[in-house]
């Protein structure tokens, strides 16, 4: 099965019922780089409602997959993010969604 990687960082934003969702797709080659990116984003967006993410990283011949809902209802955020990477056969990438809840909260 063919695998794909990201050539560069991508960003997108979605607004719904007063809430804002900002997504980042970032190429990463090590889990440590995911943690660095998350630390930077948590400092940059300290008032975010949630920072959910999923990653797939092929390191030393082993595929490492992880997802977290970061306080959202179980299975509602992290797993769907991870599934985007899986369905598209993307490795060495993390997708991070930063959410701010408005009137929907």
Report the location of each language-model feature:
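Short, charged beta->alpha transition segments
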Residues: 78-86
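C-terminal regulatory domains involved in ligand/effector binding and gene-expression control
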Residues: 1-76
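Well-ordered alpha/beta subsegment
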Residues: 104-105
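Signal for well-folded cores of large energy- and translation-related assemblies
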Residues: 42, 85-90
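Glycine- and acidic-rich phosphate- and metal-coordinating loops
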Residues: 91-101
